[in-house]
Amino acid sequence: MTTREFDYIICGAGSAGNVLATRLTEDPGVTVLLLEAGGPDYRFDFRTQMPAALAYPLQGRRYNWAYETDPEPHMNHRRMECGRGKGLGGSSLINGMCYIRGNALDYDNWATHKGLEDWAYLDCLPYFRKAETRDVGPNDYHGGDGPVSVTTSKPGVNPLFEAMVEAGVQAGYPRTDDLNGYQQEGFGPMDRTVTPRGRRASTARGYLDQARARPNLEIVTHALADRILFSGKRATGVTFLHGSARVTAHARREVLVCSGAIASPQLLQRSGVGPGEWLRELDIPVVLDLPGVGRNLQDHLEMYIQFECKEPVSLYPALKWWNQPKIGLEWMLNGTGLGASNHFEAGGFIRTRDDDPWPNIQYHFLPVAINYNGSNAIEMHGFQAHVGSMRSPSCGRVKLKSRDPHAHPSILFNYMAEALDWREFRDAIRATREIMRQPALDRFRGRELNPGADLKSDNELDTFVRARAETAFHPSCSCKMGYDDMAVVDNEGRVHGIDGLRVVDASIMPIITTGNLNAPTIMIAEKIADRIRKHKPLERSNAQYYVANGAPARGGKPARAPAVV
């Protein structure tokens, strides 16, 4: 590095950090150091650039921190996968590319918390629009000139997508043309962070490509943040490991922690900010006893409901190695074909009970039967629904195990700890079976492969969930925003009790949102970037949005009644 002092130091070049680096350096008089523990975003590496290759980065450690939980007490004491992105782009470099913002009522609910009144949906919507360029053009809900390239599914990609959406409608649930528009609730096409040329649209591509040549931005990869430095109760810089060297950089204005819901609380704790009793166990000098750091950890858990496909229209042949060179060549030369899609092109959100105020279950439809990380592929034509509950009351924690920055922390999500979790997963399995029984899927639907049609009782379904449910890779809320005793940051991401230090990423969500987390994380960073720059907030939207207000979860009876259990 040519200088050791910057206005801002950003720890983590992921979904949020790249937004901040790009927006802050729009001011030519501001200098920014962006630190990333992983490597560059190689634009010719098919593992991260080809949408259909999304499982590959999760199978190694080049782009994946590959965290693992402690034995989960309610999940047969399994140690469960917790993949997080490592490299420029962070988790936007390895995620499933589903662009889902969450439900409007998620943000309206945040705004009911003391001090978070300006996080209501209509306050957030302008920042979602600012970040986005949608291929079908802008409207009241979508942007047309933002850094994130969003494409929406088009008809005719695979007959299974249209059949699964139609089956949801036949089961009595709404149809929606836009899961990010007026009405999230219902079934419809899925927006994706994929470019019109069929490449992954990570924040490294969308944001950093605009900023990396600016003289006031310095990007250092393979730079592992060790500790935040303090003078009293003010953050003054960061010590990081770069190769064999330990480097210290000073921040004239602020240190911005954007390391994600696992690594952000880990870095704070290692630096002496966190629950005092945890820090003293490791002989870490306590800068500030802040009990919420690492607590309130939330995630989405999901399961795969899989069926045999009677017609040869699934992606099963694409899993065979002898077909993959042709798929890869078409993608590389033309940006088209099976390689150009993440194949999550349809999905939906439903309420399983009439008294649920907004959807509590999410669906991703996939025209093949396989685990998200590419494991356990079914050796036949098949299709599946990824199904999971959205706002589990179960919370966990991230706790430092070592002062060594290379050591992974102790992670416990505490999945399925509450009775509501079990009720919602049973409801989800039964609702999914009813959807899959509808006439739209008659020509495709074969045997139920998982859980298996013979599993019907509550105990049998619970046993399946306990053994087979997996993470949806949505950790969040471990440095939550708010003003209660467990809050870590205020409504602008500033760490309570510390000057010159913010956390800006999914960890500051007070409650997890309804859907995938990449889009909300980008929005959070856009909104706080304006606060850091002391810009006037974008004008509040006046767009309309759907509120159930006690309406039935289904608008009518299913075309085909559920099977008798």
Swiss-Prot record:
Keywords: FAD, Flavoprotein, NAD, Oxidoreductase. It catalyses: choline + A = betaine aldehyde + AH2; betaine aldehyde + NAD(+) + H2O = glycine betaine + NADH + 2 H(+). The keyword NAD applies. GO terms for molecular function: betaine-aldehyde dehydrogenase (NAD+) activity; choline dehydrogenase activity; flavin adenine dinucleotide binding. Its EC number is 1.1.99.1, 1.2.1.8. It is an enzyme of class 1 (oxidoreductase). It holds the Pfam family GMC_oxred_C. This is Oxygen-dependent choline dehydrogenase. It comes from Burkholderia mallei (strain ATCC 23344). The gene is betA.
